[in-house]
A protein has these predicted regions:
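An aromatic/glycine/proline-enriched structural segment found at the starts
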Residues: 1-4, 165-166, 173, 202-267
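Histidine-acidic residue clusters that define the catalytic metal-binding segment
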Residues: 1-18, 117, 143, 161-201, ...
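Mature N-terminal segment immediately following signal peptide/propeptide cleavage
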Residues: 3-43
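M16 family metallopeptidases and their MPP-like homologs
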Residues: 30, 35-51, 57-61, 76-122, ...
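Active-site SXXK
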Residues: 56-70
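Acidic/histidine-enriched alpha-helical segments
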Residues: 127-145, 210, 229-245, 296, ...
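Non-catalytic, conformational "gating/processing" segments within enzyme and secreted inhibitor domains
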Residues: 137, 152, 185-221
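Short acidic/His-enriched helical or mixed secondary-structure segments at domain edges of catalytic enzymes
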Residues: 139-158, 237-256, 293-303
Length: 326
């Protein structure tokens, strides 16, 4: 489909890629007309890897504040994100990870114009009020505490902290408690103004829609937003070569232990990554896997999981072995 204002990039596996010429926004269209529903998702190429000491957890806290109102969609007008989407019966959420933050809505295809307008507005018109930061900080801190009470999550966090001494994968997405509690609304605004721009984002639309109409709506609402006024900061820090094994011990209340082994592995875009994923399945996916037969079938473990973390930069290939009683 040729639409004025867009550059067609390529099609692969049923996915059509376009670039909005006005500002560099990447658009992925995946038509699927079996039901009158769509999924609209905006992914920002910013995650906890973009944080530094003092702002760890800022990406996640900002994700929470993205639901607290923008200039044209807020509770004072009776059309905040949650109010508007709830009235349409939409399912919606957001997630923050090491490499990215995404916001998505599953809703009827007749609501496409509404959701495009709403997401475009909060890309650059977020209110970001201190009165919203304080209660959301408490919510995020509670998430942090739940993670601290999870043996597996605590173990993963400590392994990443030991595996990465230079690269920002060193700290978890949730951040450190003191940063969560003390990061200012001004610092969050600075983070928002640095990374939340169309040339640092991808819009993905899946479902029942006409491509020309969808691109027209995206151009109408996103095309008025400029590119980032300054270059988006890039992470150039590379983790130095590890010179020996590293070990961590995490102690938590409980009866059973967990052994985890993490090997350095390549980034998700590396040509060897698919082979590592297949290796993980052979070793630990299901009751017929080799580690399951050697450990779980012999009552040495209660299960096993192995596989690589799919990340933008060189990652870790994990093997988790929850120990059986005795």
């Amino acid at each position: 489909v040729a639409v004025d204002g867009f550059t067609y990039v390529k099609s692969r596996g049923g996915i059509d890629e376009y670039t909005l010429e006005a500002n560099g926004l990447q658009v992925l269209l995946i038509p699927e007309t079996s039901a009158p529903v769509i999924t609209f998702m905006v992914t920002y190429r910013v995650g906890s890897r973009n944080e530094v000491t003092g702002t760890t957890g800022a990406t996640h806290l900002l994700e929470h504040l993205m639901f607290k109102g923008s200039v044209n969609y807020n509770r004072d007008k009776g059309n905040s994100v949650d109010q508007l989407l709830a009235r349409t019966g939409a399912q919606f959420n957001a997630t923050t990870y090491l490499d990215r933050t995404n916001y998505y809505e599953n809703l009827g295809s007749d609501q496409l114009a509404m959701v495009v307008g709403m997401e475009a507005d909060r890309m650059r018109n977020l209110l970001l009020r201190e009165s919203d930061r304080r209660p959301e900080m408490t919510v995020v801190r509670n998430e942090f505490e739940r993670g601290e009470n999870s043996p597996i999550q605590s173990l993963i966090k400590e392994i990443f902290a030991a595996a990465y001494v230079a690269h920002p994968y060193h700290h978890s997405t949730i951040g450190w408690r003191s940063d969560i509690e003390n990061v200012s609304i001004e610092k969050l605004r600075e983070f928002y103004d640095t990374f939340y721009w169309p040339d640092n984002a991808t819009v993905t639309l899946v479902g029942d829609f006409q491509s020309a109409e969808a691109l027209g709506l995206i151009k109408q609402h996103y095309g008025v937003i400029t590119r980032a006024p300054r270059p988006i900061p890039q992470i150039y820090t590379e983790e130095p070569e590890q010179t020996g094994p590293r070990r961590v011990v995490v102690k938590r209340p409980g009866q059973l232990g967990v052994i985890a082994i993490a090997h350095k592995s390549p980034a998700a875009t590396h040509p060897d990554f698919p082979a590592l994923a297949i290796l993980g399945s052979i070793l630990g996916d299901g009751k017929n896997s080799r580690l399951y037969r050697e450990l779980t079938d012999k009552n040495l473990s209660t299960g096993v999981f192995t596989g690589p973390f799919a990340l933008r930069d060189p990652s870790l290939h994990f093997t988790f072995i929850p120990l059986a009683p005795g």
